[in-house]
């Protein structure tokens, strides 16, 4: 089969980009002829199937032939103008996206113009999505979100990512130092590292935290660790190309996200590696953990501290 995979350009190689790369490799391994594009200048009529992994522009989305298109919905962006499914009041939002109430939320965004444009084009986006042959999500949680936004249930397929625990790398990632608690991910607000630091400060037993990843919250997190008096127990290791090796070496992997994670790839990988996981029970994280993690109420710092004491 001849397949076109569409993924819009991004300056960041995040989870969606990694997923798309793996998907392309898998399709080619299955014998399909696959082209990858970040524009649609190609003649789409010559393809048997169009796979869309990320498309923020609704005008572009409307150009894909509905009968051939399979749309992978990786996150909340297609149904939330703010993209993260929480309000400017820093609360998670479970309402369907639309002119109401999103028209009041979008102007309060930092990047309010794109958010407002997404509000005004929500109807067009939903109609385009509903017309596609199939929509693929990575959790039952996300299927429920799409259904609440008017997408017919029979068009939504739940396909969790295939997690393969790779072989241990030859490099000793910590130079012999054992890892106690590990956080691996972007240092952005929704990932909840600030809640993890607060929980560490409340624990009776001092623990060491290694952080793998970078992001715009790093300066604030360093300052918070110092303010809480735990800076000597928090190691910022920056971006690492081999996070699975760090997970293998960890006594416990912590996933303190307080936004509604569509799935939770880090949690799933840690479970696949046989590592203990402590996470907030929010969004798709319970599914990603598969009943093999300690889950605590979302945002409950005391409960997180108690769970880490026992990890």
Language model regions located:
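A conserved mid-protein helix/loop that constitutes part of the nucleotide-sugar donor-binding site
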Residues: 18, 179, 183-202, 216-222, ...
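Acceptor-binding helix/loop patch of EC 2.4 sugar-transfer enzymes
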Residues: 75-119
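Donor nucleotide-sugar binding/catalytic pocket of nucleotide-sugar-dependent glycosyltransferases
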Residues: 104-168
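Active-site donor-binding acidic/aromatic loop of nucleotide-activated sugar
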Residues: 217, 231-240, 246
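Short alpha-helical segment that forms part of, or immediately flanks, the ligand-binding pocket
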Residues: 244, 262, 267-272, 286-287
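A short hydrophobic beta-strand element within the catalytic core of glycosyltransferases
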Residues: 253-255
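Short hydrophobic beta-strand element within catalytic cores of glycosyltransferases
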Residues: 276-279
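Conserved acidic donor-binding segment of nucleotide-sugar-dependent glycosyltransferases
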Residues: 291-302, 309-311
């Amino acid at each position: 089969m001849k397949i076109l995979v569409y993924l819009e350009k991004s300056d960041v190689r995040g989870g969606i980009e990694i997923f798309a790369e793996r998907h392309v490799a898998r399709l080619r391994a299955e014998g399909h002829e696959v082209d990858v594009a970040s524009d649609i200048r190609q003649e789409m009529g010559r393809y048997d199937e169009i796979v869309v992994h990320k498309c923020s522009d609704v005008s572009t989305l409307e150009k894909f032939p509905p009968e051939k298109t399979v749309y992978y919905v990786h996150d909340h962006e297609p149904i939330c103008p703010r993209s993260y499914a929480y309000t400017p009041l820093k609360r998670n939002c479970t309402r369907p996206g639309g002119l109401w109430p999103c028209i009041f939320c979008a102007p309060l965004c930092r990047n309010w113009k794109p958010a407002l444009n997404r509000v005004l084009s929500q109807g067009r986006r939903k109609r385009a999505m509903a017309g596609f042959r199939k929509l693929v999500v990575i959790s039952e949680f996300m299927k429920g979100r799409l259904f609440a936004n008017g997408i017919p249930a029979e068009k939504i397929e739940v396909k969790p990512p295939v997690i393969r625990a790779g072989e241990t790398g030859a490099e000793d990632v910590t130079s012999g130092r054992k890892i106690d608690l590990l956080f691996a991910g972007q240092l952005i607000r929704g990932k909840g590292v600030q809640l993890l630091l607060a929980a560490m400060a409340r624990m009776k037993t001092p623990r060491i935290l290694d952080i793998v990843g970078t992001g715009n919250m790093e300066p604030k997190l360093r300052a918070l660790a110092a303010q809480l008096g735990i800076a000597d127990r928090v190691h910022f290791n920056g971006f690492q190309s081999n996070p699975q090796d760090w997970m293998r070496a960890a006594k416990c992997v912590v996933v303190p996200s307080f936004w509604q994670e569509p799935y939770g790839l880090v949690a799933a990988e840690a479970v696949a590696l046989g590592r203990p996981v402590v996470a907030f029970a929010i969004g798709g994280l319970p599914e990603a953990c598969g009943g093999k993690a300690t889950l605590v109420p979302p945002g409950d710092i005391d409960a997180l501290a108690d769970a880490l004491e026992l990890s």
